[in-house]
Amino acid sequence: MQRSSACLVLEGVSRHFGGLKAVDNVNLTLQPGARHALIGPNGAGKTTLFNVISGELRADAGTITLNGADVTRLAAHQRAARGIARTFQITKLFPNLTVLENMLVACEALDRRKFTMHRPLSSCPDLVERATNLLDEFRLSPFRQELARSLSYGDQRKLEVALSMAGRPRVLLLDEPMAGLSSVERDAMQALLRKLDSSIAVLLIEHDIDVAFGFAERITVLYQGRVLTEGPKEVVSADRSVQESYLGLLVE
């Protein structure tokens, strides 16, 4: 795959915990606008890989390149400023702030201006406009003045994805955004994900094979920290090693 135009490139990325090779020599390339799924059984290293990409964990080996720049040693907030955003398996919101306030905080986080008690976020029209537009996009406007903790779980998951879009990311990491959702909520989330900006590269962790293969154009299968196979979804689904090690015996 061509790397000169790639927005994210992992080369030989590893992360070990003592003798456990949680992520082992992983190579991955995302082009702008990619829709890519990362699948594998529990314990395969998927979330650990996300943590390494986003800077929550440091790589023990290998390099991570974002938009042509080496970000391997940068902290998470520095990578976020350069265009990486993510969601988590467990929703991370400010439960005692309103939906709009959550959105404003996310929009301000990557803004260069400094805000104080004497200059509240709501006093900045462009931030309010950005926050309001995102709430509209994710169909959360009716709840803008409600506390985040009062939202249904499905709407909390939607809010987290909306928050991840606040900084206009180039690469978006979605860690099981449909986990724990009802069938109706899953359908709504899938519809929203299909409408994400087509210029953003999206890497999705998803246990539901139908969802993963329905969303992504390319699939990477991770098994025991290593890439078992990677390629177009039609090729991966027909791969016998994938059928035996994941889609068959080890699917959970």
Language model segments and positions:
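Glycine-rich phosphate-binding loops of nucleotide-dependent enzymes
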Residues: 2-252
